[in-house]
Regions:
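A short, conserved structural fragment
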Residues: 1, 127-137
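Minor-groove-contacting beta-hairpin "wing" of winged helix-turn-helix DNA-binding domains
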Residues: 1-7, 138-144
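Short, surface-exposed helix-loop/turn micro-motifs enriched in polar/charged residues
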Residues: 3, 97-100
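Intrinsic disorder/low-complexity detector
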Residues: 9-92, 99-111, 146-182
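Short amphipathic alpha-helical interaction segments
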Residues: 113-127
């Protein structure tokens, strides 16, 4: 007896809402490819997308292995969102020396549904790694190393998504086609 599992409309809508955070930036990087989350409505495209993602995971190719320093954020509940939130605040106030931003562990805890203790542990780890400093006066110093870390993470993330979608930039198409015929 075979059991066939099929995604529900509600499940697909939630998947598309979640994946729009990846598809939208990639569509900006490759405007001629007409990339949008509605590609996930196509069973074959959706299957191939997740098959490629699974191949990376099964080979052990994770963010923490490729970019281990980002693990102090992304391996924690809400850590990825906290990292991105701090980055976006820092970019608004960026100087050559980093940025100084308003900071409240309580605000981050409420925003990302984690405890203040959890936020403080993430911040303490990031501070010990030299990415930022809680100034203790409601402000935080964000160092250039943190900004570089997040930008490296984002670049890797979008590279993964580009591969999962199977986008091959025009300048590589000819070379890819030639090697596949050899």
């Amino acid at each position: 007896r075979k059991t066939k599992i099929a995604p529900t409309e509600k499940g697909l809508d939630e998947l598309k809402r979640y994946m729009s955070g990846a598809f939208t930036p990639v569509s900006i990087l490759y405007p001629t490819f007409n990339i949008n989350v509605n590609l996930l409505d196509n069973d074959t495209l959706r299957h191939n997308f997740f098959r490629r993602a699974a191949e990376y995971l099964f080979r052990g190719l994770t963010f923490s292995k490729v970019l281990p320093e980002v693990g102090l954020f992304i391996d924690k509940d809400g850590g990825r969102m906290i990292m991105l939130y701090l980055y976006l605040q820092a970019i608004k106030n960026k100087t050559a020396y980093g940025a100084i931003i308003a900071y409240s562990a309580s605000t981050l805890a409420k925003e990302f549904f984690v405890s203040r203790i959890h936020v403080n542990r993430i911040i303490k780890s990031a501070q010990e790694a030299g990415y930022l400093k809680d100034r203790g006066d409601g402000r935080m110093s964000i160092y250039p190393a943190f900004i570089e870390l997040v930008e490296n993470y984002a670049g890797l993330y979008f590279a993964y998504v580009t591969h999962y979608i199977n986008v091959v930039p025009k300048e590589r198409r000819h070379a890819v086609n030639m090697t596949s015929t050899l």
